[in-house]
Amino acid sequence: LVGSEMCIRDSGGSVGLSIFLAQPRALPAVLSVMEYHPFGSQAFFSLDKQDYLVVVAKAGDDPKSADELHAFYARHDQGVQYHAGTWHHPLLALNQVCQFLVVDRVGGEGINCIELDINEWQVQVEF
């Protein structure tokens, strides 16, 4: 599916597959946190034929405002892969609970999830 050289950076670990159950968000979706994973990429695929929202910001320094965020409407037949270090909001399911196949780094050293609270920005996404 995804080669380990695409998923893992320096600190070890291996590629893992899991199923994540995303709770639906009413629109407009209120954004609360951005996160990135410094040691591995992540890929997500909807298993329930449900569309979802994707919110990202450039890899690197913490985003400083909502102006640095980019939102996309993803169809159920589109997967998404975030390169290591790419800022993103956790999965935003629409309409109903949705299962996602997740390809992620497991194990290894170091903290692989860095979060940034963006509640004070009061960001809402609507399509």
Give the positions of each predicted feature.
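Helix-adjacent hinge/juxtasegments
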Residues: 15-54
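His/acidic/aromatic-lined binding-pocket segments of jelly-roll/cupin-type domains
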Residues: 42-45, 80, 91
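Short, small-residue-biased leader/transition segments that mark boundaries at the very start
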Residues: 1-8
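Long, intrinsically disordered, low-complexity Ser/Thr/Pro-rich regulatory/activation regions
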Residues: 114-127
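A short beta-strand-loop micro-motif that forms or neighbors metal/cofactor-
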Residues: 86-113, 117
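Short connector loops at helix/strand junctions that flank enzyme active sites
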Residues: 12-14, 37-39, 47-49, 67, ...
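A short beta-strand-loop-beta hairpin characteristic of the jelly-roll/cupin
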Residues: 48-71, 111-116
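Conserved metal-binding segment of the jelly-roll/cupin
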Residues: 73-87
